[in-house]
Amino acid sequence: WIKEYKGKIADTPMDAAKDCDFIFTCVGNDNDLREVTLGDKGLFKTAKKGSIYVDNTTASANIARELYKEAKSKGFDFLDAPISGGQAGAEGGILTVMVGGDEAPYKKAEPVIDCYSKKIKLLGPSGSGQLTKMVNQICIAGLVQGLSEAINFGMNAGLNMHDVIEVISKGAAQSWQMENRHKTMIEDKFDYGFAVDWMRKDLK
């Protein structure tokens, strides 16, 4: 990556955060997030006063509020900013970003977040970004489950599901999941993108 873009590699989150005006993370879950922030080599040890830390992890609202308070006590700001859009959205810089936190740091961070997003919105105080992401995940889980059941029903009925989706995707059943996931689901290909285990984690 650094062969193509300017930057440097750090051995630890603590090293990476030194002297940064903006800090960004995106890890797997609450435990991972706690380790890279509050752990022995966590970024909270070196984040400078006045800096803004933006976390794109899908985590709990509780840890978001915890990190917000801890950041405030150390003189810098924290925004919980989970993302939606999947691998393709990340690679294309067209993610949706749901933000919780204070308005002043949000306004400062917005132009930076805009580099990898198509929609950014401050949704309320700390934790609001994570709560909004939960709404998002509940909607997606229901849509994917419904699409899976529908494809299975249609295939068992002997229908050409590519033709079926072509038709019904132009009606009230249309969704982003239908448009972007039906081909691989029909072909039984599930070796990329967002893992089911991560969705289970989000819905707990």
Residue ranges and their predicted role:
Residues 174-204:
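Interdomain hinge/lid region at the active-site interface
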Residues 1-5:
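NAD(P)-binding Rossmann-fold cofactor-contacting core
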Residues 27, 53, 58-138:
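Rossmann-fold dinucleotide-binding core
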Residues 150:
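Cationic-aromatic interfacial patches
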Residues 9-77:
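Rossmann-fold NAD(P) dinucleotide-binding segment
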Residues 129-140, 187-197:
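A short glycine-threonine-serine/GTX helix/turn-capping micro-motif
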